Amino acid sequence: MTISVEKPIFEEVSAFEKSGDNIGELKLDGGFSMPKMDTNDDEAFLAPEMNAFGRQFRDYDVESERQKGVEEFYRLQHINQTVDFVKKMRAEYGKLDKMVMSIWECCELLNEVVDESDPDLDEPQIQHLLQSAEAIRKDYPNEDWLHLTALIHDLGKVITLPQFGGLPQWAVVGDTFPVGCAFDESNVHHKYFVENPDFHNETYNTKNGIYSEGCGLNNVMMSWGHDDYMYLVAKENGSTLPSAGQFIIRYHSFYPLHTAGEYTHLMNEEDKENLKWLHVFNKYDLYSKSKVHVDVEKVKPYYMSLIKKYFPENLRW
């Protein structure tokens, strides 16, 4: 079955930034435009200036005990995410032989996961999923595929649990980046890539590396983690989510692309169209993190109906 997505109405803007007058206004990189929301401006989701710890979002330089752990996480990630490692993980987890369960069962399982790479929140993951989904649902009530995408975008983090192989957090969470080409300096804590074997490999350390310009992100190997795993689960289990939804799942942690604007030379035209939706999604993914809990039982029936619409009852994981 093919699902068509109504293209958003676009307004011309020139940069991805917060407006000084309205912190909820989202502006997009490279002249991309913002889809008009279905709610009035006064009712729309406002991006807060501070995270749950009272600090700026994605501030990796402020000194704190949590930040020390985040930096150590990125040191390990940057050293160990190599082409060979990614190939090994893709082969292992591509078997989808870890478990059979429903999407909602996986949501509940995610309660056991706390993301050590996240400087903004230390809450159970299901709350972040519901916070993102409910914020999008309010502003874009007619885009049900986007609501569901928000709900499931982080489900791949279950691969850090013992029943899924118990991967270390550096192989599950954090910002993602291409392997097989040069590590762009926009990557958080870039200095640690010097200890990555691929950094010194002449086949991999040029701008294009093993890829060609405009080859399309689908042909690019990303650092292994929950993004690629959940994309694989959705694709191989026959999800009918539209291309934009699957793109969001696969690249929502690719901050060097969707926030810094790097690696665009690897994109094709379809990637560029889908990136517009990812820019929309990122506002809610990043800024909806808070200590205010969503009533799970109250919203569960709605999301169960979306799961039934876009996914089989049980999936191979």
Curated annotation (Swiss-Prot):
The keyword Metal-binding applies. Expressed in flowers, leaves, siliques, and to a lesser extent in roots. GO terms for cellular component: cytoplasm. Fe cation 2 binds at D154, H226, H252. InterPro entries: Inositol_oxygenase (IPR007828). Its cofactor is Fe cation. Fe cation 1 binds at H128, H153, D154, D285. It comes from the Eukaryota. It is found in: Cytoplasm. Binds 2 iron ions per subunit. It catalyses: myo-inositol + O2 = D-glucuronate + H2O + H(+). Belongs to the myo-inositol oxygenase family. This is Inositol oxygenase 4. The lineage of its organism: Eukaryota, Viridiplantae, Streptophyta, Embryophyta, Tracheophyta. The gene is MIOX4.
